[in-house]
Amino acid sequence: MAPIDWKKWRHVTKLDPDKKITRQDIAAIVDSGTDAVMISGTQNITKENVGNMIDMLAEYSIPKVLEPSVSAIIRNDVDFIFVPSIFNTKYSKFAVGYHKDFVKNYPDEVLDKVIPEAYIVLNPLSAVAIVTRAQTGISPREAAAYAELADRFFRFPVVYIEYSGTYGNPELVKAVREKLTNTVLYYGGGIDSREKAETMAKYANTIVVGNAVYKKGGIEKLKETIVK
């Protein structure tokens, strides 16, 4: 089997293990044209509900990504493990602290699947912002500086602009993209229409769609957001 080139993904569907979804919906998501499925959440994430989600996806060949909020849920039966480091927080445990324990406690076969993400969290009302005490009120220039730091200094393969449920500022995303040379830019937050998807896809290499899946008519909304 050829290696999976995650850098070429244009659209990723994010599924929250704490939210209900049917096997029929899973099949429709896989068939939608999305490039990969990311299993990710902040609240009430357990080994059990992560395992249930992975089991529902097991029969499909679509690339599977686990984005853990805690190291206890990490599993090896996925293609990649995208590990966030929160850049816009004063609390180092969310940037390197928990990650040190992860590296210390997991074998190479797991660590080899890790793709580090430089996270810039921008929705102050989101669970991830509250938990990490992210400094969300930053300007496009400051966000771009964080992104350039991730790219030039720390060589992160991914910068992730996270608006988490609300639609963000395209000018901020554009400013970030202009500072990246080698790093892939992910954008997630509030994409629930073709127009919003196309706007953010002009600047982000990859857009991530999550909450739209769980709204009324969610699968059809998801299909509207597929860009290539």
Swiss-Prot record:
Known EC number: 2.5.1.41
Protein name per UniProt: Geranylgeranylglyceryl phosphate synthase
Cofactor(s) it depends on: Mg(2+)
Chain's role: Prenyltransferase that catalyzes the transfer of the geranylgeranyl moiety of geranylgeranyl diphosphate (GGPP) to the C3 hydroxyl of sn-glycerol-1-phosphate (G1P). This reaction is the first ether-bond-formation step in the biosynthesis of archaeal membrane lipids.
CDD domains found in the cross-reference section: PcrB_like (cd02812)
Binding residues for sn-glycerol 1-phosphate: K14, Y160, I161, E162, Y163, S164, G165, G190, G210, N211
Annotated Mg(2+) binding sites: D16, T42
Compartments reported by the entry: Cytoplasm
UniProt record similarity statement: Belongs to the GGGP/HepGP synthase family. Group I subfamily.
Pathway connected to this protein: Membrane lipid metabolism; glycerophospholipid metabolism
Keywords: Cytoplasm, Lipid biosynthesis, Lipid metabolism, Magnesium, Metal-binding, Phospholipid biosynthesis, Phospholipid metabolism, Transferase
Record-linked PANTHER family: HEPTAPRENYLGLYCERYL PHOSPHATE SYNTHASE, PTHR40029
Originating species: Methanocella arvoryzae (strain DSM 22066 / NBRC 105507 / MRE50)
Biological processes, Gene Ontology terms: glycerophospholipid biosynthetic process
Pfam families: PcrB
Record GO cellular component, one term: cytoplasm
Reaction catalysed by this enzyme: sn-glycerol 1-phosphate + (2E,6E,10E)-geranylgeranyl diphosphate = sn-3-O-(geranylgeranyl)glycerol 1-phosphate + diphosphate
Enzyme class: transferase
Gene Ontology molecular function: magnesium ion binding; phosphoglycerol geranylgeranyltransferase activity
Entry keyword annotation includes Zinc: no
